[in-house]
Amino acid sequence: MGRHFDIGYFKKTLKVRSKVAKERTVVNKMYAWQLGKEYYDGSRLNGYGGFRYDGRWLKLLPKIIKRYKLTKNSKVLDLGCKKGFLLKDLNILIPGIKSYGIENHDYALKNAVKSKSKLIKCEYTKLPFKNKSLDFVIAFNSLYMQNLGDVIKSLKEIERVSKKSYIVLASGEN
């Protein structure tokens, strides 16, 4: 833990998000905090703005797969999986991999893409996995909406379920 690993997240996306953030009103932010239809599939000012599968993780996942030596025998968790796009691409790149997604909001799960991954609704602070049962856990832009106490609990849970404590935490805001 503690080493920097740049997966090369989409630079153009970060520029667009920065511009949109300046235009958001209080009402837009209220929609965003609900993490429902308006956030995922409404206006860009409310959140993702038409959050649809586009295969973007197919370009980034090979770096992660190589770095963490993921194979079809690996067990992977995407914590805060949203609509499951990363997991869908992971299953395309490594057929047969055991992959799980945890999301704590109904709308994203009900509108998730079809994939071989098992998607579970639960809080990030109480993961339904045995100790040291997962080869890799990614928490990408998922913990930032929690209070500090829950962030700490979530990080402890990630460490508890990870065999090697491989964690990728990222935010495109700063």
Sequence positions of predicted segments:
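N-terminal auxiliary segments of SAM/dcSAM-dependent transferases
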Residues: 1-30
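Class I SAM-dependent methyltransferase Rossmann-like catalytic core
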Residues: 41-56
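Conserved alpha-helix/loop element of class I SAM-dependent methyltransferases that forms part
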Residues: 54-71
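Conserved class I S-adenosyl-L-methionine
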Residues: 73-82, 166-174
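Class I SAM-dependent methyltransferase SAM/SAH-binding core
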Residues: 83-126
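A conserved beta-strand element that flanks and buttresses the S-adenosyl-L-methionine
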Residues: 138
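A short glycine-rich, Lys/Arg-flanked "PGG" loop and its adjoining helix->strand segment in the class I
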Residues: 152-166
